[in-house]
């Protein structure tokens, strides 16, 4: 039965609501060489459980590039991707798609959920 009390019940779902460089604070804009912060829900990262975060973009030669990122930390509402060396030389205007594959829940067999968000380099 769906009722008003369930309208905002998002517990158990992965969500990426904003990605920004620590200094710019402009949502969905990252700056080369700056720390990248992610805000959302259920952003707990565990490499041991098989979680992954990747960044993909098209380089100047038209080739698709993808790199795996290792978050420095992740909690429920936030994740720190550090200063990814692979993204340090991207030119302004480049679109980067971040893909988060995280197991949400405490159980060992918690389901993997996927969230994507595209940002641009400022």
For the regions a protein language model found, what residue spans apply to each?
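Short, surface-exposed alpha-helix to beta-strand junction/turn motifs within ectodomains of secreted
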Residues: 43-64
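Beta-strand/beta-sandwich contexts
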Residues: 2-50, 108-122
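A structural motif
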Residues: 38, 79-83, 94-101
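Solvent-exposed serine/threonine-rich low-complexity stretches and specific carbohydrate-binding patches
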Residues: 61-82
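Short, proline-centered helix/strand-breaking motifs
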Residues: 1, 79-88
């Amino acid at each position: 039965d769906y009722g008003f009390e369930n309208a905002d019940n998002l517990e158990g779902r992965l969500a990426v609501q904003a990605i920004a460089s620590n200094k710019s604070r402009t949502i969905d804009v990252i700056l080369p060489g700056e720390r990248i912060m992610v805000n959302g829900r259920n952003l707990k990262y565990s490499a041991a459980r098989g979680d992954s975060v990747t960044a993909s973009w098209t380089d100047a030669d038209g080739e698709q590039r993808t790199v795996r990122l290792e978050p420095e930390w992740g909690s429920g509402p936030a994740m720190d991707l550090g200063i990814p060396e692979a993204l340090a030389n991207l030119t302004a205007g480049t679109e980067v798609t971040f893909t988060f594959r995280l197991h949400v829940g405490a159980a060992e067999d918690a389901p993997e959920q996927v969230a994507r968000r595209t940002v641009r380099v400022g």
